[in-house]
């Protein structure tokens, strides 16, 4: 394999200067998603976008199935009688709920699920009898509905979240439930690593935890414009839901005890993060494992008389790749130039492009172009499959490395409010000394003009032996670092 063109990746200026405008452009031009559906916050997945989504869903299923989770499917309707049982939950969600206001004869009030804790608990109560039925781990990938009043954005802030994976687990005690929380965090790390996403893991502050949770752990990625995007959450719910739904089990000692529960969710936001993180002004780069087409083959010939010279080697190449289990597509469109096809498939994020022209036929070789760096290599046909496998692995590693390098360069510490404000304006995530007091934390948010992501779980959260003061409450000694950022 011989390098014949050095790296010359596309610029990212347009992406960074107006990320949402760029994202709309990508979704439209790459034929991923259509935003023109006439309901605010509800959009259409187009065939190519749906193929990407299915690959991500299969990844999610794989890591849940491998860890003892079982897939279920619950109705979209939740009786208000159930929804209203957990006081903090209804307080947190009632303003976002879509109500079923009509439907045949007037009957009980129904809501369209915003999340399914209150739908699942009444059924779990019927399924669990004694300690032998625990732990119980189920998940579903469904639509959930939230009446967003803020500005909606495709895949990022929706009224219908159509790829909502929610897992719900039930345990005998707090210790086992918190072990499940740790496992859920590991599952999400594996999913996001496969998507080549970099992430911060934060314990959300009390004022921003999931409604009805004892605590919430969140995964946040930082987009190229410096704003954070929440891409996954894990909640320890304690006995908050099992108390009100009377979910108990008979223990081995013959006593009846309350079960403990967890829940954790991920949605199409993760796909948005993947497309944007690996995006540039030419389109995006899909991680090879998740790309519907891993290799596109472009025949290069001029005039119909050259086609019979080139096409046999093109088809041989495609067959070799197919037989090796590589997802390959040959673009044989005669009404499009090779240059147009290069642009088109770069836009759609296909990781590798194979070019075969008349000179390549004479040498029994092909030219491989990487989407991430636009480097080109000349490879003999006999070595092509091995070269493609090697380059796909290299593309994946480069996407992951690049994402982590960019994220790590954005996290800074600030021991002064003005320094913190300046860092936020530069698109940084700022770690600020905090006493742990909720009122002081909320005041820090206001002073800095950013949102609190919480305390870091992927780094040392303690300020250690430093004599630092809470930046909003100077009379208090700081104990923790509080992360803040601008946020989608």
UniProtKB/Swiss-Prot annotation:
Keywords: Aminoacyl-tRNA synthetase, ATP-binding, Cytoplasm, Ligase, Nucleotide-binding, Protein biosynthesis. Its EC number is 6.1.1.15. Catalyzes the attachment of proline to tRNA(Pro) in a two-step reaction: proline is first activated by ATP to form Pro-AMP and then transferred to the acceptor end of tRNA(Pro). Consists of three domains: the N-terminal catalytic domain, the anticodon-binding domain and the C-terminal extension. It comes from the Archaea. SMART domains: ProRS-C_1 (SM00946). The gene is proS. GO terms for cellular component: cytoplasm. One of its GO terms (biological process) is prolyl-tRNA aminoacylation. It is found in: Cytoplasm. PANTHER family: BIFUNCTIONAL GLUTAMATE_PROLINE--TRNA LIGASE, PROLYL-TRNA SYNTHETASE. Belongs to the class-II aminoacyl-tRNA synthetase family. ProS type 3 subfamily. InterPro entries: aa-tRNA-synt_IIb, aa-tRNA-synth_II, aa-tRNA-synth_II/BPL/LPL, Anticodon-bd, Anticodon-bd_dom_sf, Pro-tRNA-ligase_IIa, Pro-tRNA-ligase_IIa_arc-type, Pro-tRNA_ligase_II_C. It holds the Pfam family tRNA-synt_2b. It is an enzyme of class 6 (ligase). Homodimer. NCBIfam families: proS_fam_I. One of its GO terms (molecular function) is ATP binding. It catalyses: tRNA(Pro) + L-proline + ATP = L-prolyl-tRNA(Pro) + AMP + diphosphate. This is Proline--tRNA ligase.
């Amino acid at each position: 394999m011989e390098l014949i063109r050095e790296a010359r990746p596309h610029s990212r200026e347009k992406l960074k200067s107006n990320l949402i405008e760029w994202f709309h452009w990508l979704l439209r031009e790459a034929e991923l998603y259509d935003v023109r559906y006439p309901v605010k916050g509800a959009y259409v997945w187009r065939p190519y976008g749906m193929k990407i989504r299915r690959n991500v869903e299969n990844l999610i299923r794989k890591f849940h199935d491998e860890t003892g989770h079982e897939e279920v499917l619950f109705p979209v309707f939740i009786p208000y009688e159930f929804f209203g049982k957990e006081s903090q939950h209804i307080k947190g969600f009632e303003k976002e709920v879509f109500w079923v206001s009509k439907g045949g004869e007037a009957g009980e009030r129904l809501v369209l699920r915003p999340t399914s804790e209150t739908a699942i608990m009444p059924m779990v109560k019927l399924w669990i009898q004694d300690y032998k039925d625990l732990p119980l781990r189920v998940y579903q990938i469904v639509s959930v509905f939230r009446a967003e009043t803020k500005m909606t954005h495709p895949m990022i802030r929706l009224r219908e979240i159509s790829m909502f994976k929610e897992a719900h687990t039930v345990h005998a005690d707090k210790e086992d439930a918190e072990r499940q929380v740790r496992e859920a965090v590991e599952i999400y790390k594996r999913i996001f690593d496969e998507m080549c996403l970099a992430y911060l893991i934060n314990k959300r502050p009390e004022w921003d935890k999931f409604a009805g949770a004892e605590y919430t752990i969140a995964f946040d990625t930082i987009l190229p414009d410096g704003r954070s995007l929440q891409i996954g959450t894990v909640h320890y719910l304690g006995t908050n839901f099992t108390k009100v739904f009377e979910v108990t089990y008979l223990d081995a000692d013959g006593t009846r005890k309350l079960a403990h529960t967890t829940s954790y969710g991920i949605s199409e936001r993760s796909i948005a993060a993947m497309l944007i993180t690996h995006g540039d002004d030419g389109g995006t780069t899909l991680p090879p494992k998740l790309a519907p087409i891993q290799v596109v083959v472009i025949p290069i010939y001029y005039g119909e008389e050259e086609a019979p010279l080139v096409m046999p080697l093109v088809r041989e190449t495609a067959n070799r790749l197919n037989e090796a289990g590589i997802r390959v597509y040959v673009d044989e469109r005669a009404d499009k130039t090779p240059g147009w096809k290069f642009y088109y498939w770069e836009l759609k994020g296909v990781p590798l492009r194979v070019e075969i022209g008349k000179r390549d036929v004479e040498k029994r070789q092909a030219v491989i172009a990487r989407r991430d760096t636009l480097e080109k290599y000349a490879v003999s046909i006999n070595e092509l499959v091995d070269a493609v496998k090697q380059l796909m692995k290299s593309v994946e590693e480069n996407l992951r490395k690049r994402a982590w390098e960019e994220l790590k360069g954005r996290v800074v510490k600030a021991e002064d409010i003005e320094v913190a404000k300046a860092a936020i304006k530069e698109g940084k995530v700022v770690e600020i000394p905090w006493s742990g007091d909720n009122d002081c934390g909320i005041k820090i948010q206001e002073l800095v003009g950013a949102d609190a992501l919480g305390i870091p779980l992927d780094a040392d959260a303690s300020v250690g032996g430093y004599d630092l003061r809470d930046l909003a409450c100077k009379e208090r000694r700081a104990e923790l670092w509080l992360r803040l950022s601008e946020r989608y």
